């Protein structure tokens, strides 16, 4: 695992873009995906199943020098997909996020990582392109009805369904008020995307 910074993430995403699109098209999708996870481990515990990992103190690590390397982070959905994870949530359940919940700094850095990947791959930051593992696991775009395994079905995977923050306080996969973890993270990522774009105009 190698420590990197936000500009590195954008550069790697840009260099990986063409191959990611080609991989996606090879499995019948028209675009790459970004799947957001947590490790369900300790805050500094790294796993090489994910392209990018963010620790609880906000440090960023990559497992490979290309995001087009296929890693095993999401069941039947790894080709042409970038897996990003927060190192947190050991012992978490739907009532309590355990001994190491996501930290504020981790959430902000993670959102910047998502924004940088989407900038580099030319992906719009929305739920079609950027999903939590749980959202992907409940998606009929990717799975047959009998194979769904997210928080609205079997709950085998519910990564980042809630963040334990004011914006996303509780487990509620049916929420439509923007409080689901994926909605909050996409909102933050879009904020960073827009902030960087405005600053670039002023430079």
Q: Predicted regions span which residues?
A:
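Short, solvent-exposed loop/turn segments at the edges of secondary structure
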Residues: 29-31, 47, 77-81, 125
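Structural preference for beta-strand elements that scaffold enzyme active sites
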Residues: 33, 81-83, 129-131
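Peptidoglycan-targeting cell-wall enzymes and recognition modules
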Residues: 51-104
């Amino acid at each position: 695992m190698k420590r990197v910074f936000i500009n590195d993430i954008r550069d790697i995403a840009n260099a990986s873009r063409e191959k990611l699109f080609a991989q996606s098209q090879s499995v019948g999708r028209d675009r790459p995906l970004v799947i957001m996870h947590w490790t369900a481990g300790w805050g500094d515990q790294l796993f090489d199943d994910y392209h990018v990992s963010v620790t609880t103190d906000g440090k960023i690590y990559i497992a490979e020098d290309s995001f087009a390397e296929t890693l095993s982070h999401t069941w039947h959905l790894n080709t042409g997909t970038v897996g990003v994870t927060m190192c947190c949530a050991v012992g978490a359940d739907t009532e309590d996020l355990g001994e190491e919940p996501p930290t504020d700094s981790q959430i902000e850095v993670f959102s910047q990582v998502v924004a940088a990947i989407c900038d580099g791959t030319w992906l719009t930051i929305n739920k079609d392109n950027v999903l939590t593992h749980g959202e992907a696991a409940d998606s009929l775009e990717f799975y047959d009805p009998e194979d769904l395994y997210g928080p609205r079905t079997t709950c085998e995977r519910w990564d980042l369904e809630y963040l334990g923050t004011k914006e996303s306080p509780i487990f509620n996969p049916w929420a439509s008020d923007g409080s689901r973890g994926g909605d909050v993270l996409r909102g933050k990522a879009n904020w960073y995307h827009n902030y960087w774009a405005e600053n670039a105009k002023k430079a």
